[in-house]
Structure formats: structure tokens, C-alpha cells
Amino acid sequence: MPNIRARFVAALFASLPLLCLRSTNLARAADGPNKAEAQPAPKAPSIEPRYLANIRQVTSGFSKAGEGYFSPDGRTIIYQAISDRYPFYQIYTQSLAPGKQDAKQEPKLVSTGRGKTTCSFFAPDGKSIIFASSHLDPDLDRTEDAGRKKLAEEAKNPHHRYQWDFDPNMEIFSAAVDGSHLRRLTYSKGYDAECAYSPDGRQIVFCSDRGGNPNLYIMDADGGNVRQLTHEKGYNGGPFFSPDGRWVVYRSDRKHEGLLQIHVIGVDGRNDTALTDNGGVNWAPYWHPTKPYIIWTSADYSDPRVHSNFDLWLMKYEVRDGRIAAGKLTRITDDPATDILPVFSPDGKRLMWTSTRTADHTSQLFIADFTLPQE
């Protein structure tokens, strides 16, 4: 399933250039030989300026980087990235420079530098972080060798599909913001990852396959008092607490394997509600910090003949009869690149996401000033 929170069940997308080429060829074939000299239809104006301003790339120097989150004061980001020196994602923090350019600051490695890592997040007090890591893998040397070989193969085939594996050696750790005082929080056999703090910092919601299927669990911030939140078939992951701490938003493919839908559930395990029900892949949901909106990534796969791009979508919601009720849906991005993993700054005025709208089509982090849709 998507790693995304970057967390993935299966292959989510091929490289952008290949997909664009395929869609172009389909269009030309449909035109037929008599349409060879026809002029292309005028391109519609982008919708992005309505919601996104001052778009800027804030990571560089990595083979790929993504899944970033803001610190509580909005001055630092934490994210995962692959350097040219190691085959797996590691966790980095990076200060944001003041002003419109935001960040070109030096990243700081805060994970161990070995193993696979993912799903980092700041504690609400800004003094600690959590992330998932497999650096305790007893066969780590062999795993690293396999990872290097895989990277070499991918370099020969730039159109490979990415697939997230549920590494059974993945555990959740906490640390100081500089990476010191590393502490293991989970000890179950199997995959433990996709973690986020509650607004008060007292609890952590995460995904685990300790019971068979990947489901959601909640534990105290020190790793104690673990309880299962969802009891569903398929994959259920990528959870985040709502700003008031009463709800958890997440993604699930319980209805159709590989077709993820956005769900919300009460922290008491009641009133599980699907906000989407379509033939697409909907994932990486995230709450707006001050207004009743949830943003996520979506691509429509209902028609296999049509290329579907991953874009960002925003839904307004309301609490009705003890449940989260879906409201108006607004598309936020329409760039030909892949746009995924959106998150808001603590004040809701900026949006950060992972995109391949780079010169070399690698995935990197972008930040933009954000405006909500007009009511």
C-alpha cells in the first residue's frame, strides 16, 4: 500500500513521462489519419492559482524526497529522503528560512542512517519526534545489499513502479528533534509504522499488521496501553488525529483491494464512515488545522483506457448525528506532474506536498501559500 502517508499496498503509479506518452498516443490514435493536421484544443487555464500561490521547491540534492510535516511552530519540516549514498529512505529535519523562499537550508539526518525509515512526525510540544525504522533488522547487511541492487536496476529502468513492502522489521521509535535519545516504542512481531501524535501529545495512532491484516491502533506516547481501533479486512492505514482529538482520518481498501477510500472513525472505535466511494485510489488524508476540511491525494482508475493523474483534492465536512459527513469536493492541483501527500502548516496558511513537478521529474517537497475555496 502506499507508503504514504507515503505508504503503499501496491504499485500506485509509473513514472510521469511514460504515462504522458501513452495518453498522447491514445489521443492521436483516436483522431485517425484524417486528423493529422488538426490543431490541438486550447489548454484550459490551471485551477491552481485559485488556491496555491508562491509555489516553491524546498528540497533538493536527494534522489527523491517527500512525505513532509511541519513542526508545531511552522519553522521546521521533517521528511524522508533517499541520498546517493544509501538505498533506503532516511529521516531529515530542515529549517525553513523566513520569507517567500521558505527553505534552502541544510537538511539534518535524524534517523540512524541505516535500515528503511518512514512516517516521521513532530510531537505537539516540538521537543521530540517519532518515525518508523527497520534498523534493528537482524539481516540488515543483506537487506542493504538487496536495496543497492534494486536501485541499480531501477536506474536502468526509469519507468519502474514503486511498491511499498510491509517490512516485518519496521518498528516505531521516538527521539529528540536532533535524533538523540532514540527510544523504541513498539515490540510486536510484524509491521508497525504510519504513526502520528494526538493533539495533546499523549497518544500515538499507528498502523500494524500484528493481528494479520494491517489495522489501526492507538497507544500512549511511551508505547504503553495499546488498543486496536479498527478491525477490518484488507489494509487500513495512514491515520491522523483530528485537531480536536475526537476523530481519526485514514485510508482503507476493505471494499476493493488496491482501491483506497478515505474513512474517518471516532477515537472510541465507533461511527466509522467512508468519505469516498469511487473507482479510484484515495489516500494520504490530512486535516485542516482550523477549518472543517480534509485534503488528500486521488486518482480515478474507473476507466483503464484513460490515464489518471494523482492530484490533490479538498473536501469540506460537517459533524452530523455523531458522524463526519462528506461535503463539497474541490480539486486543488491539475499539473501534469504527480502531486501527493498534502499537509497543512499549523496555521493552515501554507500547504506542503510531494510532487514530481521538478526539472528532472524526481519527487521533491513543495510549499505554497494556501487559500481555501470561497464559500
Predicted feature residues:
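N-terminal secretory signal peptides that target proteins for export/translocation
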Residues: 1-6
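Bacterial N-terminal signal peptides
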Residues: 10-22
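A periodicity- and composition-biased signal for non-globular, repetitive helical segments
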Residues: 11-13, 28, 322
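Signal peptide processing junction and immediate N-terminal pro/mature segment
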Residues: 20-33
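Sequence signature of WD/YWTD-type beta-propeller architectures
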Residues: 30-375
